[in-house]
Amino acid sequence: MVKFFTGSDADKAGDYNLSHIDLINHNGDIIDLKYIVIEMNIYESIYKNAVTGSIVITDAKNQIGRLEVQGLERIAFKLSSPGTKNVEDMLDASVETGEPFHIYKITDRKQIGPGVMQYTLHFASREFMRNLRTKVSQAYNGRLDIAVRKILQEEDYLDSRKKLKYEKTGNSNKIVIPNLRPFDAINMIANQSLPEKSDGVGYYFYQTIKCFHFRSWDSICLLYTSDAADEAS
């Protein structure tokens, strides 16, 4: 059950503040979902290249039923835990100060009452959508973490504005990307990457709600250590 709180109303374990949640269609029209969302899930994992999520909606006005998903629809919201004051501890997917998620499919359509439909909207980060529409055909020389940063940030590829937290690679190879999607290209580079300061083999490229990471398993286990640097997007 999605709960909307203001101020000190959200004080129980598992509660959170979700001040608004809007669907923005490809024409820029805004549909207020605040009171028809019954469930919201956000997924992140070191085994996933992008953050994804889903919301379950009960729709008595057929607002979503008329929506043809074109990959341009967005979900905008702000999510925080009770008592959170630091902006960096919030999930800001608002239009004004953050980056909304993109809807990529609708599933589980069913009628649950007279004139009432229920749907699940699946959404993902902007980079997830860019990955579906872009290919990389490029040769890279030098440190492999630099190649990853280029694929993540350059306009021709993922064009991400999010921060990348990375561990420098110890090997500098020439690598040729043979017309792959950006995530596949980065995963290929990750498999060939060697840490600069440990004996591990292979890196993980993943997204959290705050940023992207490119680091070895040892670095993940040690969390943020002195050999992990921050690169602003």
Predicted regions and their residues:
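Single conserved hydrophobic/aromatic residue that forms the stacking wall/gate
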Residues: 224-232
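Short, conserved phosphate-binding/catalytic loop or strand-edge motifs used
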Residues: 125, 160-173
